[in-house]
Regions:
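N- or domain-start disorder-to-order transition segments that initiate the globular core
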Residues: 2-47
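Short pre-active-site segment immediately N-terminal to the catalytic Zn-binding motif
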Residues: 55-65
Length: 229
């Protein structure tokens, strides 16, 4: 059991709260980073599977799906790992038991898990460098690849929109059930961020500019807006 004192400082974090959670046989420890206000929740238990996640509050302000595109884009190379797709390399070469990134209606989450200590720390390092030092602020091509771009296959064919997220959301919006669910959500929450499609509406995705893309990254992807577990 960890021997920690409430209100004491540990590596720049202030220890704020301790609670036993019998249902998951864990002791939870809550910390707050003194300089940035970042929250950290640590689960103390005997589970051999180690899990790490960093999340950011990302309430959408339109239907462009900027946070969904950012979720994809931060994993397209970073300062320390300048590969085209480090996420794909981790999927192929790490010992992870879970590796993903998810965009919700009001937050974006980057979770990893592994039973191997060295692999676990490497996964954390790659993800932390990805969210705090991504190449997307320098490479407009990342937005074009993951978000949207124009594509012309021949002079006889019309110009089309393409992009990883754009194509993904076209598939989502091809479902009548999804369209109905979106209409219900807009009706239920007309004056909140939940009225917007956080994943991106294919009609609105091409409205996202590179300048706004970078501004939203800088505004929301910072330690003071993060929650770490």
């Amino acid at each position: 059991m960890l021997d920690l004192q409430l209100e004491a400082r540990y590596h720049g974090f202030i220890y704020q709260e301790r609670e036993e959670v019998e249902e998951i046989k864990s002791i939870t420890h809550v910390f707050e980073h003194e300089k940035t206000g970042a929250k950290l929740l640590y689960f103390e238990n005997d589970d051999t599977n180690k899990v790490f996640s960093i999340s950011f509050r990302t309430p959408p302000e339109d239907d462009t799906g900027v946070f969904h595109i950012l979720e994809h884009s931060v994993l397209c190379g970073s300062r320390k790992y300048p590969l085209k797709e480090p996420f794909v390399e981790l999927v192929k070469g790490s010992l992870n038991t879970f590796l993903n990134a998810m965009t919700f209606s009001d937050k974006t989450m980057y979770p990893v898990a592994s039973q191997n200590d060295k692999d676990f720390h490497n996964l954390m390092d790659v993800y932390l460098d990805a969210v705090f030092h991504p190449l997307l602020t320098e490479k407009q091509s990342i937005l074009k690849q993951e978000g949207w771009h124009y594509e012309l296959n021949s002079v006889e064919e019309p110009i089309e929109y393409k992009g990883v997220v754009y194509n993904e959301m076209k598939g989502v919006f091809s479902s009548p059930e999804q369209i109905l669910m979106r209409s219900i959500q807009k009706s239920l929450f007309p004056d909140t961020p939940y009225r917007y499609e956080s994943g991106g509406d294919p009609i609105a995705i091409p409205e996202l500019t590179y300048d706004q893309f970078v501004k939203d990254y800088q505004r929301f992807y910072n330690a003071s807006n993060s929650f770490i577990t």
